[in-house]
């Protein structure tokens, strides 16, 4: 029978195709089995004058815990069958059953296929009854005990939750000869089916999309001399001033002020009264704004503001300059138009691998 069990286990391996049949770590499973139970080396003290039917139907159920890929623990119930002996003078029957506890050691050999061994013990109960001397004497008895248990098998998972196994189990010395009249060994070749709990894959976490980075604000400032744009104390653009603004507009296009904003600031020097100078700087800023709008900058994206004598760039360098003509020339840098452009650049992020 041992040779038959090994041959069947090898045949089961041959049906496999490439990670492991063991359940997921820290999960439970349950199942049942049915097979060929054979009592051997009965050690019977009865002088039987007829056949002893050692080959019987065996069955069982089990419940297990899978600690990891290689190690599990099982508890189960085994019915090892009823072994009758029939003769003209003596006849009777021996039966055994028990609860087993074993460690299950598995090793993956192919896709969804493991080989394993179970090592443990069987707490058994053996019962016997018989009729002797042609029915003149009858006797019965039972015994309990613990015997070592060894099993070898192969297990194939045909879905995540369902698996089938084939194994050969050996239990040594069941019963006591003086109590139940026999002390057989038992081999059980069985086919089983198990259901595994908790094998569903965990749902993938929902990853929120990475928000698009905020656009980068690109700010540039241009300074144009009023003497180039306008005549002295004037607010009308000169031809040379229009040419200067044409060149400036070409640079503004690269910043794309349509998606940003443009601020035109007009400045005056300190010659004259502050109020007229403020009004002049405003008119000059308006002239530059209107010209840039005519070139294509949206009117709602550009503003003009006169600053008058504020923020002079000459400081006190012209304090002692005379006569007036020389002072006007010295203060020329203060007479200016500044254009501040804010554009927005999109940040392009590389997709993650």
From Swiss-Prot:
GO terms for cellular component: cell outer membrane; pore complex. PANTHER family: LIPOPROTEIN YIAD-RELATED (PTHR30329:SF21), STATOR ELEMENT OF FLAGELLAR MOTOR COMPLEX (PTHR30329). GO terms for molecular function: porin activity. Residues 217-345 form the OmpA-like domain. Sequence repeats lie at residues 208-209, 210-211, 212-213, 214-215. Its main location: membrane. It is found in: Cell outer membrane. One of its GO terms (biological process) is monoatomic ion transmembrane transport. It is a multi-pass membrane protein. Residues 1-21 form the signal peptide. HAMAP family: OmpA (MF_00842). Gene3D superfamilies: 2.40.160.20, OmpA-like domain. Monomer and homodimer. Disulfide bonds join 318-330. With TolR probably plays a role in maintaining the position of the peptidoglycan cell wall in the periplasm. Acts as a porin with low permeability that allows slow penetration of small solutes; an internal gate slows down solute passage. The extracellular loops are most variable in sequence, and in some bacteria confer sensitivity to phage and/or colicins. This is Outer membrane protein A. Residues 208-215 are annotated as: 4 X 2 AA approximate tandem repeats of A-P. The record marks 74, 165 as: Part of salt bridge gating mechanism.
């Amino acid at each position: 029978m041992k040779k038959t069990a090994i041959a069947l286990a090898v045949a089961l391996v041959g049906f496999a195709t490439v990670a492991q049949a063991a359940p997921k770590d820290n999960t439970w499973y349950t199942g049942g089995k049915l097979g060929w139970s054979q009592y051997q080396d009965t050690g019977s003290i009865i002088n039987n004058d007829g056949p002893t039917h050692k080959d019987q139907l065996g069955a069982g159920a089990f419940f297990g815990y899978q600690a990891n890929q290689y190690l599990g623990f099982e508890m189960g119930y085994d019915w090892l069958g009823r072994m009758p002996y029939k003769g003209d003078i003596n006849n009777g029957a021996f039966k055994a059953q028990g609860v087993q506890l074993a460690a299950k050691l598995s090793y993956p050999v192919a896709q969804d296929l493991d080989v394993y061994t179970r090592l443990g013990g069987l707490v058994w109960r053996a019962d016997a009854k018989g009729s002797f001397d042609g029915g003149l004497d009858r006797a019965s008895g039972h015994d309990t005990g613990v015997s070592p248990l060894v099993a070898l098998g192969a297990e194939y998972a045909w879905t995540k939750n369902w698996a089938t196994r084939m194994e050969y189990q050996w239990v040594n010395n069941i019963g006591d000869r003086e109590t139940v009249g026999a002390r057989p060994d038992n081999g059980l070749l069985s086919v089983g089916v198990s259901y595994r709990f908790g094998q569903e894959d965990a749902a993938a976490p929902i990853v929120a999309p990475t928000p698009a980075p905020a656009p980068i604000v690109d700010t540039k400032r241009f300074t144009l001399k009023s003497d180039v744009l306008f005549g002295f104390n004037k607010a009308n653009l000169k031809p040379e001033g229009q040419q200067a603004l044409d060149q400036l507009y070409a640079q503004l296009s690269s910043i794309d002020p349509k998606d940003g904003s443009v601020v035109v600031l007009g400045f005056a020097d300190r010659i004259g009264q502050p109020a007229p100078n403020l009004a002049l700087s405003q008119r000059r800023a308006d002239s530059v704004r209107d010209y840039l709008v005519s070139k294509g900058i949206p009117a709602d994206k550009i503003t003009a503001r006169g600053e008058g004598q504020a923020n002079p760039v000459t400081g006190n360098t012209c304090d002692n300059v005379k006569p007036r003509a020389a002072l006007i020339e010295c203060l020329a840098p203060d007479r200016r138009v500044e254009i501040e452009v804010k554009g927005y650049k999109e940040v392009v992020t590389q997709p993650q691998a």
